[in-house]
A protein has these predicted regions:
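Core dinuclear metal-dependent hydrolase active-site scaffold
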Residues: 126-155
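Metal-dependent phosphodiesterase/nuclease catalytic metal-binding core
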Residues: 151-166, 181, 185-194
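Conserved beta-strand hairpin/beta-sheet module of binuclear metal-dependent hydrolase folds
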Residues: 1-46, 50, 152-165
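Active-site environment of divalent metal-dependent phosphoester hydrolases
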Residues: 37-39, 63-69, 86-89, 147-150, ...
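Active-site HxH/HxHxD metal-binding segment of metal-dependent hydrolases
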Residues: 41-42, 46-126, 130
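Divalent-metal (often Zn2+) His-rich catalytic cores of metallo-beta-lactamase-fold enzymes
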Residues: 74, 181-241, 245
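Active-site neighborhood of phospho(di)ester-bond hydrolases with catalytic His/Asp-centered motifs
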Residues: 32-35, 56-64, 80-83, 142-144, ...
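C-terminal regulatory/interaction regions
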Residues: 231-286
Length: 286
């Protein structure tokens, strides 16, 4: 694990460069999205055992499958999630998330001793929750856009932002919930003092310039996405034509992100009033 602040350690998975966090203070620990592979979760458990600090709380930043594998290793530990989490794991997702995990486990030759059960939160919150961890005062803040139940974790003393699945150096914004909500979330975060940034996927940074750059680039991407897709809708273009209209938009790592960009365009097309089969286009079709 890498120590980023006197109270925060981060471990990075080999899957999607996923980050897991440990906030530690006065012998008390809070885990954030512990994962992903069994041996990586075990390493987190050993880290805490060596420090005599069993976890008291697990924060799940949102309900996507790659963020949900840790709690089963820590039975009895309090789980906190945003209030929309319960709806997000119900319905179709109640079957899809375990299926995604089974597919991932089979692909990587992981022998799971028991079927996956969706983590059930012991506490949920609406827009904000203050969480004490030793002497730390963490703020859990609703930050939708990527997911309806997404939340960030902010530690004001060190101005540390755990940004969930946003502000990556590798990924563009994955607008799998709502373009409007994502824009509002980034506007909110832009007003905060942030000296240490940890994305859900990718490299953490303590560079003021890098933090500002990621915020500005992602906000600019969303603004251009909105403008171009709105133009397509107003001109009566099809969703395929909207995708072509947005094909030359600039964004980071285009070779890796061309698929997510297309899904963003399709989902924005539906959100902004375009007519298409929502089961066949956008993030909902995955």
């Amino acid at each position: 694990l890498k120590c980023l602040t006197p109270s925060l350690w981060v471990a990075q998975s080999r899957l999607y460069f996923s980050n897991s966090g440990v906030f530690l203070s006065e012998g008390r620990a809070c885990l954030v999205d512990p994962g992903v592979f069994p041996e990586e979760i075990e390493a987190l458990a050993r880290f805490l055992e060596e420090r005599g600090a069993p976890p008291e709380v697990i924060v799940l930043t949102h309900s996507h499958w790659d963020h949900l594998l840790g709690p089963e290793r820590f039975p009895g530990v309090k789980i906190i999630a945003q209030a929309n989490y319960l709806a997000a794991i119900s319905g179709r997702a109640a079957d899809e998330i375990p299926w995604q995990i089974e597919e991932w486990a089979a692909e990587h030759g992981i022998d799971r001793p028991q079927p996956f059960s969706l983590p059930e939160p012991d506490e949920t919150f609406g827009e904000m929750l203050e969480l004490a961890v030793g002497e730390l005062a963490l703020r859990l803040v609703h930050a939708p856009g990527h997911a309806v139940d997404q939340a960030v974790v902010y530690e004001p003393e060190s101005a540390t932002l755990w940004a969930a699945d946003m502000l990556s150096d590798l990924e563009i914004p994955f607008v799998s919930h709502s373009l409007s909500a994502y824009e509002e979330t980034l506007a909110m975060l832009s007003a905060w003092e942030v000296r240490v940034l940890i994305p859900g996927h990718g490299q953490p940074t303590a560079s003021k310039r890098e933090i500002r750059s990621r915020l500005e680039e992602d906000r600019a991407y969303l603004a251009e996405l909105r403008a171009r897709v709105l133009q397509a809708v107003r001109e009566g273009l099809t969703v395929g034509e909207a995708v072509r209209l947005c094909a030359d938009m600039p964004y980071r790592h285009p070779q890796e992100n061309i698929g997510p960009h297309r899904l963003n365009v399709e989902s924005a097309y539906l959100e902004l009033g375009g007519e298409a089969d929502a089961t066949k286009v956008g993030w909902n079709r995955l």
